[in-house]
Amino acid sequence: MNCRSEVLEVSVEGRQVEEAMLAVLHTVLLHRSTGKFHYKKEGTYSIGTVGTQDVDCDFIDFTYVRVSSEELDRALRKVVGEFKDALRNSGGDGLGQMSLEFYQKKKSRWPFSDECIPWEVWTVKVHVVALATEQERQICREKVGEKLCEKIINIVEVMNRHEYLPKMPTQSEVDNVFDTGLRDVQPYLYKISFQITDALGTSVTTTMRRLIKDTLAL
């Protein structure tokens, strides 16, 4: 199985990290979640509905749509909060990345553990910029909103391609494909990781600074 890989890059102010990352992660998971499966008998099931809600950002001129699952939202906020704190405490240039990996399990014979086979990975590279004035922050608020809108549109375009998704499992195999631990939604199995690094390029940050500078010059 070939694993699809998508890479996004964003440049944000420190207080925008959490909202930007939640917007991206929630958008991806909105398209990689189903309602809960209700099995009547093996091979016959119905799928519940997935509720959605709009989220208005406080520090970015942007509104995104997420699955209306408080459990899923708490899980994402926890890991994004850890990422934000790690960026803040890194003492470097505020460079890092988060990866959202979707996978399915392949049963192995005892005593070996199940094999996790990734089929799609989303990586978001983040560079935190330091701004000196409130005017710069206001411009950044608008520009990040515009850039984030472009990223979300790109995500939706990728999701609409007719590419591989794990086939719908039987009742006995549903835990190999979906996370059934949430009460109100059923995302494909996923895991989120992050790292703080100084190996990322500065092109995105340079572009953001130029946008702010050009706007101030108007």
Swiss-Prot record:
Chain spans, region Important for interaction with ATG13: 152-156
Phenotypic consequence of H31S: Impairs interaction with ATG13
Outcome (variant: I153D): Abolishes interaction with ATG13
Reported impact of D54R: Impairs interaction with ATG13
One Pfam family linked to the record: ATG101
Cellular localisation: Cytoplasm; Preautophagosomal structure
GO biological process: autophagosome assembly; negative regulation of cell population proliferation; positive regulation of autophagy
Cellular-component GO terms for this entry: Atg1/ULK1 kinase complex; cytosol; endoplasmic reticulum membrane; phagophore assembly site
Record carries keyword Membrane: no
Domain of life of the native organism: Eukaryota
Alphabetical list of InterPro entries matching this protein: ATG101 (IPR012445)
Record function comment: Autophagy factor required for autophagosome formation. Stabilizes ATG13, protecting it from proteasomal degradation.
Family membership noted in the UniProt record: Belongs to the ATG101 family.
Binding partners and assembly: Interacts with ATG13. Associates with a complex composed of ATG13, ULK1 and RB1CC1; the association with this complex requires the presence of ATG13.
UniProt protein name: Autophagy-related protein 101
Originating species: Homo sapiens
Classification lineage: Eukaryota, Metazoa, Chordata, Craniata, Vertebrata
Gene name in the database record: ATG101
